[in-house]
């Protein structure tokens, strides 16, 4: 099976910061003190005295009464009311004071509500990113989020099961006595202000849980898991869980094995496409052996492991066993290290059980506990949806190899150059073949230049930056005289311009050994200039530094103007953002990538040492401005040139034959380039980042061109004329879950 190499990118995503909020309780109303005996009798005594005084005044005659005497009963009434008011309450707060405290406390809760609401929104966004809806998984395949969970990630071996209630990460802490809400003075609940107490209880119940939050199940916690209940719902949940695992975990860190009685069951046959179900080394006639078994013997190697430990990481990939037999995997209750068995069905012996209901909810059960609701909406995915995801993932692998078993054609060690760029003949390579790639197209700036000698695979140099899944943006090439360096550069440039429109890439070619490398390329519409060290172009060499500096400044100015034109807050961050606005319809002119190729840059730096500063600037800012640099030389020892400042930004290295092991190690980290023989012109090693060097052979395009005859395939060995070979008939095997046996070749 042919696969493309996929290098996982660790993505951080939204951040979640747990916190704690110490909730201030409502005020204490105080304890009512019962009145004393005197306080109880006093109102009656004062009432009797007032009545006696009125009786005396009436008996003595009203005419003899002074007006001031009439005020005395009124004064006594006022004194009695005041005494009653002062004697009641028993030390508690007055009503106006209680109302004021209540308003202040409700304002306090309103302020907290703003914080916890923002925290809840962040929590839902965090889990929505790391646990996207099953319908969004297909769009993640092929992006930098695919296989982005390393073994040390928090959610390594975790999968989404649905949405439901989650405890808020911003925990609400309440002061309590005996489990009840209490005031700061530890007064129990009955003595709290009742209205404020009611609101704080509602606040805790409302904001203590986050509703409709995506939920992840950490498989490493449990050795065995059973998913039962409604059969269709359980199967849909298991399908969604497996697809989530396959999209976010690379096959070298998570392996999926399947135990089933029907390997070609249409509801589960899609599993065979997952890279995680492919054996890393064993093959059959259809490619990698599928880890789909009908008997327990396929799991026998796992039984030799130690008991399951939730906190330990396996030495190899974590193994998820999908048991479709209802529990016949036969794993012991304590499980096995680095293994989780997920059984479809109500398997009572599992450590963790999920029971899916027809209404879409689900309950779960931990050991020695009863069932409780775990999701309000349980995930569900159809076999058709899963098949689309699995088939799309099948095109990727960690190594990007082509297995020998899948091909019954004679391996092509070298192919004519025009065939590699998609043409049947050189005559077909015309401007009509130029492509306008979208900015996110993986094939943009991906240049074929030869074949890997070990496998015969086509070799590409992807000069896009690493964030765009490329090997660039800057690199270095070394090769001594006769190594095929000039041939490599010509092949690289012609392959690029044969497939890419001039509006997407321009060239600035510099040759400091007389101009023979890029001879004739000044006629290409992609070429901005060809600069050599010929005497008549000496002034142009001196001006090249000014031209490149001006180009960097021009691109920065264009990004500032474009930012104002599209209404951005400031200058656009780079050409990538510029292209996004263009693809959305913004009226912006094309801003093609500038590919600067400098042959014999060591000679250039010896004559113009000030160029080292310019190259350093290109390496630093060229990434966002899309000015890509390739520095080529015969030797790093010419004139004592040192490029220490540039090396950290040179992300790909190419070494053809070198004169010493020191130069080979300086470029690709190994001495292998020194051992390339004189007869292997065009053979070299490509190293990208910290990966191992890959040996390749470039095309030979400087020889005479002969159109291929009908029915005959022309192979052009690097450094030699073409050879004619006929293609053998290919054998096609049906890709099944079960092993495909080898067939004897027919004479």
Curated annotation (Swiss-Prot):
Disruption phenotype annotation: Disruption abolishes EsxA and EsxB secretion, but not their expression. It results in a lack of antigen specific immunogenicity and leads to attenuated virulence. Mutants exhibit defects in bacterial growth during the acute phase of a mouse infection. No growth in the human macrophage-like cell line THP-1, no cytotoxicity; bacteria grow within cells but do not kill them and do not spread to other host cells.
Disulphide bonds in the chain: none
Keywords: ATP-binding, Cell inner membrane, Cell membrane, Membrane, Nucleotide-binding, Transmembrane, Transmembrane helix, Transport
Transmembrane segment boundaries: 41-61, 65-85, 222-242
Modulation of this protein's activity: EsxB binding to the second FtsK domain of EccCb1 causes multimerization; a subsequent unknown step relieves the allosteric inhibition of linker 2 on FtsK domain 1 (this subunit), activating the ATPase activity.
Catalytic residues, chain numbering: 600
Result when mutating residue 543 to A: Decreased export of EsxB
Subunit text: Part of the ESX-1 / type VII secretion system (T7SS), which is composed of cytosolic and membrane components. The ESX-1 membrane complex is composed of EccB1, EccCa1, EccCb1, EccD1 and EccE1. Interacts with EccCb1. Residues 62-332 interact with EsxB and an artificial EsxB-EsxA heterodimer.
Name of the featured protein: ESX-1 secretion system protein EccCa1
High-level lineage: Bacteria, Bacillati, Actinomycetota, Actinomycetes, Mycobacteriales
Gene: eccCa1
